[in-house]
Design a protein with these regions (language model features):
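Active-site gating loop/helix substructures
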Residues: 18, 125-225
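Patatin-like phospholipase
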Residues: 3-11, 16-107, 146-147
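Non-catalytic peripheral regions of patatin-like phospholipases
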Residues: 60-107, 147-150, 160, 198-293
Length: 293
């Protein structure tokens, strides 16, 4: 396939600030090979969503060229991530602005206030498409924010939404037990089903968790496992950047261990299917934390 024909999808996994830093390196590798211009779709989870949101915020809401990324954006992002303790800022916001059970909403405020992530999806460039992946508590499905769609097939979709970037990112990073759900008031929005027909929301409140509860790779917007694997229409080559770490040994201690084991096994199955797909079709890469690129 010619370079000019590439339509690259980036699936950037969760993993907190560690993931954000790892993904900066993957983007650097693409920029060094003048490939950022070929990126057509970015799907991000948790810390990766923070990374991409900061990238847009520091580049006038545009996805950077390879040259811009290397000379200006990467140094700026590194300084911001390393010098601003977002977790500490979010805790302060939670104490003074919200009830402490709304820590995810406090993260949104901290992202806007301390990282400068303002505006909505309607303010960022149309290409590449950016899908911020969350998990719906109510439906148990993959809930997505992007320039052209907000919602999931089981709950419905928001029409004409310019949803705030910081809020979508905070929802994507709302890890159960540590942070809790991000809460959305559904009443101000007009909802529709997949065909575009107006519907009434199933509840007044919608609660979103970290996208990693459903898919820590953020693969689904780009790659589907059906029919031996297939890409979305806007992608013909993809890179799964896995910044996660393997499950470690732990003595019996907490019930949350069952979540660790289940999530790890789901990720392993997704990774195996994706690796098999790109091996058969020669149309992707799978860099993993600790294994290089």
């Amino acid at each position: 396939m010619k370079r000019s024909e590439l339509k690259i999808g980036l699936a950037l996994s969760g993993g907190g600030i560690r993931a954000a830093i790892y993904h900066l390196g993957v983007l650097k590798y693409l920029a060094e090979n003048n490939l950022l211009e070929q990126v057509t779709h970015i799907s991000s989870v948790s810390g990766a969503s923070m990374c991409v949101g900061l990238l847009y915020a520091k580049n006038n809401m545009r996805f950077p060229t390879s040259s811009e990324y290397l000379t200006t954006i990467l140094p700026t992002l590194k300084e911001q991530i390393l010098n601003v303790n977002l977790e500490q800022k979010a805790i302060i916001e939670a104490i003074f602005k919200f009830k402490f059970n709304k820590k995810a909403n406090a993260i949104a405020l901290a992202l806007a206030k301390h990282w400068g992530i303002n505006g909505g999806f309607g303010d960022i460039s149309k290409k590449p498409l950016w899908s911020v992946v969350c998990t719906s508590y109510e439906t148990g499905k993959h809930f997505r924010f992007s320039q052209d769609i907000v919602g999931d097939w089981a709950f419905g979709y928001i029409k004409d939404s310019n949803f705030p970037l910081a809020d979508a990112i905070a929802a994507s990073a709302a890890f159960p037990f540590l942070i809790g759900t991000y809460e959305i008031d559904t009443k101000p929005f007009e909802w529709c089903d997949k065909s575009g027909t107006k519907i009434e929301p199933k509840s007044d409140k919608l609660h979103l968790w970290d996208g990693g509860v459903y898919d820590n790779f953020g693969l689904e917007p780009i790659y589907q496992m059906e029919n031996n694997g297939m890409y979305s229409d806007d992608v013909n080559f993809s890179i799964l950047s896995n910044a996660g770490k393997s499950i470690s040994f732990q003595s019996k201690k907490t019930v949350t261990r069952i979540v660790d084991v289940t999530t790890d096994q789901i990720s392993i199955l997704r990774a195996r299917a994706f690796r098999d797909f790109i091996f058969r079709n020669k149309n992707g890469y799978y860099p993993k934390n600790g294994s290089g690129i």
